[in-house]
């Protein structure tokens, strides 16, 4: 449910920013807000607190951010407060980044392997993914010891499973079809 809400808010903000040709600036401003909320957890708690009134929360927001960010982003933050969605800010920001990257024809991908990939292999995989997807792929490597071998790539809503386990399962299915 929270993911769906985050996508809706992110999409609405992105549409406004895109129409104004400011979606990259808005991305930077949201990153600024996210970093401040991360560094100052007490601020984050104040904005989420049911003890603090909505008016006080808006005043806190105004004092800290009004001169630092555009009116569009500031008003967006106020809307989040009005709708009691300030706790969803980080998820909304993550969804917004995905939309902004798509607007720049970029996509983030993760290569999950049992051991760290060397930079050369990571670069080769990144180039191949970029060529096959037609997008600029930003690839990072994550380690998962449960991966026996090979690589599992998560790119947007696609999963490319090149792991040994997937290949063994595929071979098993083929053998079962022959036997039956």
Curated annotation (Swiss-Prot):
PROSITE patterns: ATPASE_DELTA. It comes from Alkaliphilus metalliredigens (strain QYMF). Keywords: ATP synthesis, Cell membrane, CF(1), Hydrogen ion transport, Ion transport, Membrane, Transport. Belongs to the ATPase delta chain family. The lineage of its organism: Bacteria, Bacillati, Bacillota, Clostridia, Peptostreptococcales. HAMAP family: ATP_synth_delta_bact. F-type ATPases have 2 components, F(1) - the catalytic core - and F(0) - the membrane proton channel. F(1) has five subunits: alpha(3), beta(3), gamma(1), delta(1), epsilon(1). F(0) has three main subunits: a(1), b(2) and c(10-14). The alpha and beta chains form an alternating ring which encloses part of the gamma chain. F(1) is attached to F(0) by a central stalk formed by the gamma and epsilon chains, while a peripheral stalk is formed by the delta and b chains. Its main location: membrane. This is ATP synthase subunit delta. Pfam families: OSCP.
């Amino acid at each position: 449910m929270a993911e769906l809400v985050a996508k809706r808010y992110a999409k609405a903000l992105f549409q406004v920013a895109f129409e104004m040709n400011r979606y990259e600036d808005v991305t930077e401003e949201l990153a600024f807000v996210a970093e401040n909320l991360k560094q100052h957890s007490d601020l984050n708690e104040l904005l989420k607190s049911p003890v603090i009134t909505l008016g006080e929360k808006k005043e806190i927001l105004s004092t800290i951010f009004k001169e630092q960010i555009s009116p569009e982003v500031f008003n967006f933050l106020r809307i989040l407060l009005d709708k009691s969605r300030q706790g969803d800010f980080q998820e909304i920001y993550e969804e917004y980044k995905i939309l902004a990257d798509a607007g720049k024809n970029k996509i983030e991908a993760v290569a999950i392997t049992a051991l760290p990939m060397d930079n050369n292999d990571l670069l080769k995989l990144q180039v191949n993914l970029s060529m096959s997807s037609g997008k600029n792929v930003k690839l990072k490597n994550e380690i998962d010891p449960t991966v026996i071998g090979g690589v599992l790539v998560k790119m947007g809503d696609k999963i490319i499973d090149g792991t040994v386990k997937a290949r063994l399962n595929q071979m098993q299915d083929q053998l079962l079809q022959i036997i039956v």
